[in-house]
Amino acid sequence: MSKTHLTEQKFSDFALHPKVVEALEKKGFHNCTPIQALALPLTLAGRDVAGQAQTGTGKTMAFLTSTFHYLLSHPAIADRKVNQPRALIMAPTRELAVQIHADAEPLAEATGLKLGLAYGGDGYDKQLKVLESGVDILIGTTGRLIDYAKQNHINLGAIQVVVLDEADRMYDLGFIKDIRWLFRRMPPANQRLNMLFSATLSYRVRELAFEQMNNAEYIEVEPEQKTGHRIKEELFYPSNEEKMRLLQTLIEEEWPDRAIIFANTKHRCEEIWGHLAADGHRVGLLTGDVAQKKRLRILDEFTRGDLDILVATDVAARGLHIPAVTHVFNYDLPDDCEDYVHRIGRTGRAGASGHSISLACEEYALNLPAIENYIGHSILVSKYNPDALMTDLPKPLRLTRARTGNGPRRTGAPRNRRRSG
């Protein structure tokens, strides 16, 4: 993490439980990010927090640090049963829940608090086995949490800490009724520490905070500009016929170390994957139709560097902590302006530079004015020479269950640059 993203405030300056400080410092966390410096004084004083912060600002460690400290500093509810977790962290997607769990593991190891994970699509019995042994902190998605609660595998009557991460995304995905169902089965708000984090503190998010929290303090960490000054943004206007060849040519030109390509539909993502896989790229596909075990494996391979390119729908644009992404390609301009910011926010993180390349084709160019108005600036337009685009490309692969990730290792060097001036 770059020092430019840190404050002078140290974790050791707070009255945090010694085991929490020890675990943080062991992982190299000494100074707070702005959101951590704002949140911790409030949560350590027992105040509820509703925070506005983008992914990558350190909000996950802010609420994890607060959660572990609170549980270590307060006794469990009397007569607590084995199926009663003490803290509940809700996330909108399986990937985000898994990531939060991974971030929490060093703290759990240092403190002895037990973690549980609950998400749909995979691992029902494996997750249940962990819950049956008793957990202190349960991290999960709302659907699976409700499933376990209805079958009495978990009981929320002993909850002392609640975290709602990516609250705006919860609304977007239609989970608000599930959230309210879960809250109704917990102790009253004034008997819990409540934390909510969201990329935007919209009216509906504030309404949720008012409804489910105890006089929450609002804190905001706004970037100087929504897209980040370390991200180079670039825009091309291809025809529909030239769009795929332009993407492949740009990939050969840029030769990204680690790139994410976003498209607006599952079908389009599969099409892009087929072309790139046929051309020998180490490319993975991440959409809602990919089985959960395979999704996690692909994310792990991409994070380790075994895959160079990830093709994804917006399911991967929120909450995933993938380090060192050098390039983001918007094959389709998103329909939602916020999704543009979330997509390109995968690169240029923690002080690193990044490159975002968007293709404004005939179908999605109409989304551009709203995006530029939202981010507050025009995106630099670059031209290309149609005659210099790659030709004689192999026939795209067809998607099968065995072909959603990995491929041959890249060899050689990128081809000569083909873009016109």
From Swiss-Prot:
Catalysed reaction, written as an equation: ATP + H2O = ADP + phosphate + H(+)
Cellular localization per UniProt: Cytoplasm
Biased composition (Low complexity): 402-414
Enzyme Commission number(s) from the entry: 3.6.4.13
InterPro entries attached to this UniProt entry: DEAD/DEAH_box_helicase_dom, DEAD_box_RNA_helicase, Helicase_ATP-bd, Helicase_C-like, P-loop_NTPase, RNA-helicase_DEAD-box_CS, RNA_helicase_ATP-dep_RhlB, RNA_helicase_DEAD_Q_motif
Any one cellular-component term (Gene Ontology): cytosol
Highest taxon of source: Bacteria
Alphabetized UniProt keyword annotations: ATP-binding, Cytoplasm, Helicase, Hydrolase, Nucleotide-binding, RNA-binding
Motif Q motif: where in chain: 9-37
Motif window: DEAD box: 165-168
Entry keyword annotation includes Nucleotide-binding: yes
Binding site for ATP: 53-60
Pfam families in the record: DEAD (PF00270), Helicase_C (PF00271)
Chief location category: cytoplasm
Domain Helicase ATP-binding: 40-219
GO MF annotation terms: ATP binding; ATP hydrolysis activity; RNA binding; RNA helicase activity
Region (Disordered): 395-421
A GO biological process held by the record: RNA catabolic process
Residues in Helicase C-terminal domain copies: 245-390
Top class in the EC scheme: hydrolase
Aminoacyl-tRNA synthetase as UniProt keyword: no
UniProt subunit comment: Component of the RNA degradosome, which is a multiprotein complex involved in RNA processing and mRNA degradation.
Family per similarity comment: Belongs to the DEAD box helicase family. RhlB subfamily.
Task performed by this protein: DEAD-box RNA helicase involved in RNA degradation. Has RNA-dependent ATPase activity and unwinds double-stranded RNA.
Name of this protein: ATP-dependent RNA helicase RhlB
Lineage: Bacteria, Pseudomonadati, Pseudomonadota, Gammaproteobacteria, Enterobacterales
Gene name for this UniProt entry: rhlB
